Amino acid sequence: LKVYIIILSSLIILTGCTSRESIKDIKLPGKTENYTLLPNGWKLTPAGENIGIGELPMNLIFTKNEKYAITSNSGMGDNSLSVIDLIKNIEIQRLVIDKTWRGLCFNKDESILFVSGGNNDIVYCYSFSDGKLDLKDSLNLRTGDDNLISVTGLTYWPEKDYLIAVSMRSNSIYIFDIKKNYLIKKLSPGSECFDVILDHQEKYAYVSLWGGAKIAKVNLENLEIERLIKVGDHPCEMLISKDDKRLFVTNANNNSVSVVDLNNNKETERINSALKPDVPYGSTPNAITFNTDESVLLVANADNNYLALFNISSPGESKSIGFIPVGWYPTSVKYLPGKNQLLVANGKGLISMANPKGPKPGTKSSHKDEQFVGSLFKGTLSIINFPDAKQLGEYSLQVYNNTPYFNEKKPLSDQTIIPVTHDEKGSGKIKHVFYIIRENRTYDQVLGDISKGNGDSSLCLFHSNVTPNAHKIVEDYTLFDNFYADAEISADGHNWSTAAYASDYTEKTWPVFYGGRGGTYDWEGGKAIASPSSGYIWNQVINKGLSYRNYGEFVKESEGKYSGALSELIPVTYEKYPGFDLNIKDQYRFKIWKEDFENLVAKDSLPAFQLIRLPSDHTSGTRKGAPTINAMIADNDYALGQIVETISKSKYWKESIIFVVEDDAQNGSDHVDAHRSVMMVIGPYVKKGFVDHTMYTTSSVLKTMELILGLKPMTQFDLSATPILNSITDIPDLKFYDSVKPLIDLNEKNRAGLFGGERSEEMNLAVEDAVPEREFNEILWKAIKGAESELPPVTRSAFIRDIK
């Protein structure tokens, strides 16, 4: 242990002295000779040998003889089981199944593998022999009062030949007699369940309550919940020491692992798995394993892409001993004692990849061979030899070098209007921040025709005749052509756009919903479990004592009035302003906003921060009777222009700045990447006629607003993001903005018989992005370019966001 600490400490000191000098300004993300650069400067340098498996592996199990490993893969595309030969280190079977979500366990002799059926509300029973899986049977967990179960964790009870399953929709524990195919007992611990394990004496079962920040202790003698034990937020995977004295559980929302004394049923220690003890949340520890003698605990930090190692030989005195770099979003880790190796399931794989087979609107296709960004990320299994002290030191140095906030240097900036780093003072010149969130456009779709930017005009769908205000704004102010949405779809998009983070619940459940495998859209205040512990930008504003006004973000509707979906939003949400509803024009939203704005101005009570939702650029496709695609885009564009004009002609203009983003890019066409998107910054202190090629992300926007308002960073992502400073000037230009009236009819309706009209009728447009995006983009393309048009093949790097 002392050797580990000395080596690691020395390497950290060296890194601190040299890293700033070695950082290079690399313009674009992608794979280099030595690492993969992600959009915000984080790097991937995965250790060991890496084997391709299915999409988004969620769990990992291996046989006692260490010949085989099996992963459950629960991505947006195919759900599957991957069987890996650990002698040859190859995937030997990929069994596609209808639905699965995490749960895996063997029976006593490993002849049967039990697999969670997710929202099918069943457990699959597969025979397993010589590395091959075959479906044998299934166990139906539904009872008369269950509408939806959603099976998550599983464990086998050898003494009774029972199966214990837990769920995240019915929030229940199911004890099942396998031989009799009979549900013996159903227990209700009170919140969403993630994992279930038995102690070694088979006296108790323990269930991590994902949404409850507790562990449920189940007495296996009377099959009752004996007590609930408090731990950290979003408890996920658990381990119990061989002597049944300590339970370890990862807290995904807290950068931590809770250690529970099972004799006293109390948390006695909390281990911080982040690289630095004082950094914000965002590491997302979600899986753990022991080494052979249980002296070392290994923790998989999903959003940091590394394993954290701790010496736990002395209870209550755990010590960090190093880190191991792994792949993208590690979701499971296991230790092979016979081989002294580690197995790591990487949810997003290893590298960004090209997307030459992206959707080609204009061609008839079943989409089976197309690549969609939500299913481009093939998982991998890393096989890593357990490192000695020297190797662990080298790995640790690599992890530190991969991490921007450790190597953070003060941004170079000539301007003095916005602080360059987080402090509590904020900007002395800018007092009012307006944040406008729109829906789902790529850079090339809207601005690809602007010659001074890095655009592809052949991919531009909405030229200046449709989006005259967008074009005028980026010509008058600054054009940003290297901005990337942190998110994939609206589920995580509205979280990344407001929290610089999407919780592990959001990341692990949106592929289920968007893959058509059940679930509900509950990521905008619909369920408490979806919220990050670090909160949202409005929490920071309110906690700072600043005023805030919310228009349409995270709201729910009742009898024509809109209220905040979260308690803290209720008093600051304008009840007349609609949320996401494509039947309501953005022109109406502008009218409602303007009435409130003018009233606030008249009272000299304009809030420091306003969040305004403008969703019409999502469009309704070619649904008969709905506004045409161009009409909805133009409606959105004009509303944006009118908002900018109204602010610029107010007495608050000199002290104002406006940020405009798309929550995600909807997998649209873009010659750089499907996540490159439209971002605008507007105000007197924004440079005019300037082009900023700096790489920015959604988290960059949040960080810049934090710097202006004197707020603290919410997560590691806004902490390490590049602030938008290159386009800021000390010399204000108070010229106001005149909006450009639409050049097309905003009331134009889709006629019958348009390409995709019938499919648009069938699509769920009541919920953000609850449509098959490949098909929806094809409809958009043909509606604009013509029914016979064909999008030429493009290459798109397929990174999802900053680090994941």
State the predicted function of each range.
Residues 393-804:
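N-terminal pro-sequences and low-complexity stem/linker regions of secreted or lumenal proteins
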Residues 4-12:
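Sec-dependent N-terminal signal peptides
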Residues 12, 17-418:
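Predominantly soluble domains enriched in secretory-pathway, periplasmic, or organellar proteins
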Residues 7, 44, 134, 374, ...:
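A generic structural signal for short, non-catalytic loop/turn and secondary-structure boundary residues
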